[in-house]
């Protein structure tokens, strides 16, 4: 890093700033949801669309971000990403209704979807290959600090100012980042193949419509027949994409990816697994505030052990997988996460609050081990010609499944919380207890998929990639 020219180091700082903004936003909002609900006159049990709208937009836009950067230039797209994210933040802060807030989050999601992948692409283009790992470590470090800082910062801003400030703090940072990008970042472009617009539209429509159909009756008052039509339309769009990809060699995601058994199993397991684990960052702060009466600040502080556990486990997960194998690790962590989730609910409802940080630390560790194992299992056996496409598809599936998870969590809260409930009341406890029990079942189900993974205790993605590059 020290050998790099000054202008390159400044460019890395710009990318790191974008990573920080995006990662901070993914965690800072959850703590503020109950306060947003009160301000907007909505039930706190129906605020999940604020999260879903952002994550789903990121999932939809991810496949286009790399192509746009290659075609239009990394500087232009990164600049546009920061501007859109900052404008979205401003409109979020100015929102007076839930629908306005959801639309503003969609705009924010368009910027967020381009920020991280285009940032990675920028690092690849401006840094020599020998220093790429050090540069990526540098720019992703703020992305690890964001989730650690987000819940507590969100709690402080909500408790001592207002929820609007969780979005307003992005504006000065975004202005500085946009100006620095325009002035300092080179605009690399390369020749690209034709973008698969029909495939992109089919996938985007399918993902958006299916997610909407999951919870349209509760959040938007859509009739059951209309929901059934939406579900059928979304499924048809996905099937049409599969037919399109089968006939087109230039499809967005080649069906040849699924000729690799570990990729197919890993992708299916990642999709199902992240539906369950995607509920936890949304449900935990809402449960602590609405279910137990915690202040926003204290609820935010409670999330820090979970992030610390996740960061700590990343250092040893490779050794664990090499020792026990993917199948044992994935089955054990999947069932373990379900048990830890039930333990968290039990400890909280029993009033043993002093144990909550320890349980959340354990939850973060188990979840991190499962995430890392799912990612490497999915990609480890792909040929080099398909590795980039497989990684893009995995990233899209990760975001999609998390949006579905939050949608299902909101649907469960709405289903069990039909009557008006008060903070830290017996009725509220029952609503969250039933919701958490259903969540534990959903979290545990992917163990059935992971039980089919080959028991390859000696194979590891890092090892195979190194061998392949020699």
UniProtKB/Swiss-Prot annotation:
Places the protein is found: Cell inner membrane
Q: Which GO terms describe its cellular component?
A: plasma membrane
The keyword Calcium is annotated on this UniProt entry:
no
Annotated CDD domains: MFS_LmrB_MDR_like (cd17503)
Q: What Gene3D superfamilies does the record tag this protein with?
A: MFS general substrate transporter like domains (1.20.1250.20), Multidrug resistance protein D (1.20.1720.10)
SUPFAM superfamilies xrefs: MFS general substrate transporter
Main location class: membrane
Periplasmic side stretches:
1-11, 70-76, 125-137, 186-196, 243-262, 307-341, 417-430
The residue spans the entry assigns to the Cytoplasmic side of the membrane are as follows 33-48, 98-101, 159-164, 218-221, 284-285, 363-395, 452-470
Fetch the InterPro entries from UniProt: MFS, MFS_dom, MFS_trans_sf, Multi-R_MdtD
Q: Which UniProt keywords apply?
A: Cell inner membrane, Cell membrane, Membrane, Transmembrane, Transmembrane helix, Transport
Its membrane topology is listed as:
Multi-pass membrane protein
The family classification in the record reads: Belongs to the major facilitator superfamily. TCR/Tet family.
The record's listing under HAMAP family reads:
MFS_MdtD
Q: What is this protein called?
A: Putative multidrug resistance protein MdtD
Q: Which organism is it from?
A: Salmonella paratyphi B (strain ATCC BAA-1250 / SPB7)
